[in-house]
Amino acid sequence: MKQYEVTGMSCAACSARVEKAVSKVPGVTSCSVSLLTNSMGVEGTATDQEIVNAVVAAGYGAAPKGAKKEQTAAEEEEALKDHETPKLRKRLIASVIFLVVLMYFSMGHMMWGWPVPAAMKDNHVAMGLLQMLLTIIIMVINQKFFVSGFTSLLHGAPNMDTLVALGAGASFGYSTYALFAMTGAQVRGDMDAVMGYMHEFYFESAAMILTLITVGKMLESHAKGKTTDALKSLMRLAPKTATVVRDGKEVTVSIAEVRQGDIFVVRPGENIPVDGIVLEGSSAVNEAALTGESIPVDKQKGSSVSAATTNQSGFLRCEATRVGEDTTLSQIIKMVSDAAATKAPIAKIADKVSGVFVPTVITIAVITIMVWLLAGKDIGFALARGISVLVISCPCALGLATPVAIMVGNGMGAKNGILFKNAVALENAGKTQIVALDKTGTITTGEPRVTDILPAEGYTKRDLMQLAADLESSSEHPLAKAVMEHAKATGISQTAVHDFQALPGNGLSAVRGEDLLLGGSISYMQQKVSVDAAMTEQAKKLAEEGKTPLLFAKNHTCAGLVAVADTIKEDSPQAVAKLREMGIRVIMLTGDNERTAKAIGAQAGVDEVIAGVLPEGKEAEIRKLREHGRVAMVGDGINDAPALTRADTGIAIGAGTDVAIDAASVVLVKSRLRDVPAAIRLSRATLRNIHENLFWAFFYNVIGIPLAAGVWYPVFGWKLNPMFGAAAMSLSSFCVVTNALRLNLFSVHGKANKKAVPAAKPTEMKISESEETKMTKTMHIEGMMCGHCEATVKKALEALPEVTSAEVSHEAGTAVVTLSSEVADDVLKKTVEEKDYKVTAID
């Protein structure tokens, strides 16, 4: 989508006019104009010049955005700055000064007996001329309304400024006529006529209308500026400079001068300037700016780093991999900006109304004046009713109802690592009825981990893991990697083996010293060693839970069982429960066999499991599910891209730095399943806000216009002074924008769910029962200084198979460890002290 800046728009009628004009250009397939950001997104083959010419012909200005490829975030932020409010504030102050003087002379002496200069006393012509002069000054100060309004009228596309210009102009024009008529009467000596014409002055109404509309415009402009705060805060994150290595020396250069392949250094406390790979050093990096996750992430050689994240502790030497508009931050900014330039389907009705709103209002005003004149009312009464209709009508409230909510909602998502690619995605996500979850990497971590260690008689857990690690050290199987990582996390160093063999039928063998080590699946090992019934039953039980049991033996004697599984993420059950609580049916898609799939599905608490689905078959399953409701597909965006595209809403989870996933309409930066219900909640809140805004905008005009026209005057005697009509108009748009800003207070994850998870399945019940036998230990630890220290200790402790969870506080200097089975204090102590912290006591 090509982006353009559009100038000269003042209301929804303007944006509708521009959109209509550009849509007619040959080669344009779609066009979306945002009054909120004064921008336009165009898709198609039309040239920039053709599009700009179409906008100019419609009476507005346009220029392509980012004409320079290396446009910095700072320049984009400058373009988003609120330049309008300061101008309006100056206009308002000047208008109020002259309005106060005008009101003093026009009403002060009559209503409150305030003194007037002797030269003015009883000199009605001089008083009228002074009022006209003061009104002209106020009209000149607010000439933008007249220039924009009448220019738009000449182009055949009247806008809100046209209504204001006609209303204030009619008041001024009729008052000027009355002034000259009064002068003629005074020359003739007809004092009764003079007094009559004096009461026909509406100079103060014209001035008050312009001033009140300026008040409303200033409030609206200020509030609109707030809606882009999230986008501007992202842009402010972009570093301005980088320290790169050139000719062996460190030099500071502007961010635009950094090129792919450059070597840059980052010291503690500095922001990382561009995306890169760590070549040297280790540190903890705070990525909250991009992901919303406050816990720092460890980085070492080979780790990727992203622009705008903060290096908290160590020195890093990195190679730039993505610079300029290719960095993760730039892609996020572009995604949020593009989404703001698109329109949600719900906005179509408002756009249709906005396109004909102003001509309709002008017609109603003319009819109102004619009807009251035919009804026998004087010209002053009829004109006041017509002017009231003009100045109370507000197309801006209609035009802003949707885009302001979309902008705020999209910004809220970006702050929480939830990226909506366009307004359609933000609207559709909230209508989801079925969520289909890919298993691997979505419900589960996507990486096998050791879950159970069951030593045979005569062996300890450490003995068994030592044997397993030694045997698996030469294997390249994914399950071997899980065993090795667990051994490393628990401080087990491998012993050298020789004569390693990967045997047919899922088995391994090697020699350690004089001992023959064997390992493999239960079926294979039963052919090699004697396995007792209890161990066989335990292996069967673990397999039913979706785990892979691995049996190990030494010298043909069974040493025990180690279970490995792709474990579900910690937040998966809570996320699934939240989705079900929201009335959404949750389905898991996986290529696993039915037994493993059902075990994982039961742990996660999904409504239905569809097993044995190959990657190419997921798209067909999504097509079937769409027959039963609106479907959101959640996956990694790689092997399930066709399914994401087929779904009503494709959600890519765990995107990390690769946020530009074409197949997905919603991108979750973090690998958190709880962000799925959060995205849907945010979408629903945004939709609700849009409905509120549209209701207010339609309700205001439906009620206000008849009241201004005097429909209720014959029945109740109600009539609306044009000044009050202008005041109402000035507040209507402000109310819509302010309501949208309430979304900033919305909590995307909501309050903690204290309701019981519905209908627990047998596997879930079993897990619940086992929790009753868990025990806790409190470790007192010295040396923890920050959140990074907490994360390091927590990660180390939770790597132990006996540890269910660890709650760590550097402020209290404690770690409360929840255990599923007994573990020696020495093991816990060693685990923490290997991370360079001191354990003083364990309760």
Predicted regions and their residues:
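Conserved catalytic phosphorylation-site environment of P-type ATPases
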Residues: 290, 349, 384, 397-471, ...
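Conserved cytosolic catalytic loops of P-type ATPases
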Residues: 26-43, 48-49, 200-201, 232-326, ...
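Transmembrane helix-loop-helix hairpins at the membrane interface
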Residues: 87-241, 352, 717-722, 728, ...
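Membrane-embedded alpha-helical bundles of multi-pass transporters
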Residues: 111-125, 154, 173, 412, ...
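Flexible metal-binding regulatory segments at protein termini and peripheral loops
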Residues: 1-128, 233, 249-250, 334-342, ...
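Conserved ATP-binding TGD loop and adjacent catalytic N/P-domain core of P-type ATPases
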Residues: 16, 29, 268, 342, ...
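ATP-driven catalytic headpiece of P-type ATPases
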Residues: 90, 309, 433-476, 506-587, ...
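Juxtamembrane coupling segments of multi-pass membrane pumps/enzymes
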Residues: 76, 182-185, 190-193, 207-268, ...
